[in-house]
Regions:
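N-terminal secretion-targeting helices of virulence/extracellular proteins
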Residues: 1-89
Length: 89
């Protein structure tokens, strides 16, 4: 007999929380990008160049996380719907 393990409500809650986090993260990264661009006009030394490299590496990782999370959110919603249907049958 097939067995379903999971709570569709928990899956949906996590998907919503993940979406809110991704939205918040994207807003924060956008704001920080703007502030960093403006700062480039006044902060120009070797430490800034090193920081910029690290900053861009971090932004790239966050972009990859955003892409991965954006794939998982609809998957989690679909999984919750299928699980709910299964549990109600």
């Amino acid at each position: 007999m097939p067995q379903a393990i999971g709570d569709p409500d928990e899956l949906e809650r996590f998907a919503r929380a993940l979406q809110q986090f991704v939205d918040s993260l994207n807003d924060a990264v956008g704001n920080l990008n703007g502030a960093f661009a403006v700062l480039g006009d006044t902060w120009q030394d070797e430490k800034r160049a090193r920081f910029e490299d690290e900053y861009h590496a971090l932004v790239q990782q966050l972009t990859q996380f955003d892409a991965n999370a954006s794939e998982q959110i609809p998957y989690l919603a679909s999984l919750a719907a299928r699980l709910r249907d299964y549990l109600q049958s």
